[in-house]
C-alpha cells in the first residue's frame, strides 16, 4: 500500500502498528495526543507540524523519522521522548520536555536545532547537517537530572554555532567542529567533561570561531581546543582535567 496522510489530529491515543515496509505515515498538520504509540515495523514517520504529547513517547519504527519541516515547528513531550528507530532521524525545529528525559541516537539537521528540558536528562548521539549553516542550542536546567550528553557534532560541516547548557554536567563523547561561516562559535555553560579524547575545532579558512567553556571536570582524557585566531575563554574557577592534557591553539 502507499503512504498514509493525516491532517490536523487531536486524539487521546494514536497507535501506529504496521504498513508495507518503506511506506510513509505522514502527519501534515498539528498533532495533540495523550499517547503516541509506535511499533518496531518498517514504516517511516513524518510529523510536519507542531506536536504535543502528554505521556512518554518511544519512537521504535525501523524506518526513518522526520520531526518538523520548518524551524518554527515545536515538539513538546511532556512525559519525555526516546528514539529507538532503525533509520535516519531528521529534526527541523525544537524539542521540548518538562522535567523529563530526551534521548535520541544520531540525528541529522534540516534546520536549526533547539532541545530544551526543564530538568530532565538530555542524551543525543552524533549531530550532523547536510546543508546550510545550522545553529544548535541544547539546554537542561532546573530539576534534579539536568545533565547533557552528546556525541560528535559537525563532522561533515554545516554547523555554525553550538551552545550547550547543563545545570549539573555536560559530557562530550565526540569532537565538535564548526564551519567557515561568520559568527561560528562553541559555548559550554555549566560544568563539562569529556568521555573520550576530544577536539573542539573552530579554526576555519576565513572565519575562526570563539570557544567559551565555563568549567571543566576531570575525566583523565585529553582535550584539544583549536580556535585559530579567535579567542578561547576558560571562565570558571574550576578547570580540572585529572591526568588528561589540555592543548590550546588560539588567541
Regions found by a protein language model. Name each.
Residues 1-251:
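Extracellular lectin-like interaction modules
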Amino acid at each position: 500500500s502507499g503512504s498514509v496522510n493525516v491532517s490536523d489530529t487531536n486524539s487521546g491515543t494514536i497507535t501506529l502498528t504496521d504498513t508495507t515496509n518503506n511506506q510513509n505515515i505522514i502527519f501534515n498538520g498539528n498533532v495533540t495526543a495523550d499517547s503516541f504509540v509506535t511499533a518496531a515495523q518498517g514504516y517511516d514517520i513524518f510529523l510536519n507540524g507542531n506536536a504535543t504529547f502528554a505521556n512518554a513517547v518511544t519512537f521504535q519504527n525501523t524506518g526513518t523519522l522526520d520531526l518538523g519541516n520548518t524551524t518554527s515547528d515545536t515538539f513538546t513531550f511532556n512525559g519525555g521522548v526516546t528514539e529507538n528507530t532503525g533509520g535516519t532521524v531528521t529534526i527541523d525545529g525544537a524539542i521540548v520536555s518538562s522535567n523529563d528525559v530526551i534521548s535520541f541516537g544520531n540525528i541529522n539537521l534540516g534546520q536549526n536545532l533547539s532541545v530544551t528540558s526543564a530538568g530532565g536528562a538530555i542524551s543525543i548521539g552524533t549531530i550532523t547537517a547536510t546543508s546550510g549553516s545550522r545553529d544548535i542550542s541544547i539546554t537542561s536546567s532546573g530539576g534534579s537530572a539536568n545533565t547533557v550528553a552528546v556525541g560528535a557534532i559537525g563532522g561533515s560541516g554545516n554547523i555554525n554555532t553550538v551552545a550547550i547548557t547543563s545545570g549539573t554536567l555536560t559530557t562530550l563523547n565526540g569532537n565538535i567542529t564548526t564551519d567557515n561561516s561568520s559568527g561560528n562559535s562553541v559555548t559550554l555553560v555549566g560544568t563539562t567533561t569529556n568521555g573520550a579524547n576530544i577536539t573542539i575545532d573552530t579554526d576555519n579558512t576565513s572565519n575562526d570561531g570563539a570557544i567559551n567553556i565555563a568549567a571543566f571536570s576531570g575525566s583523565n582524557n585529553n582535550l584539544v581546543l583549536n580556535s585559530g585566531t579567535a579567542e578561547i575563554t576558560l571562565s570558571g574557577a574550576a578547570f580540572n582535567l585529572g591526568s588528561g592534557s589540555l592543548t590550546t591553539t588560539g588567541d
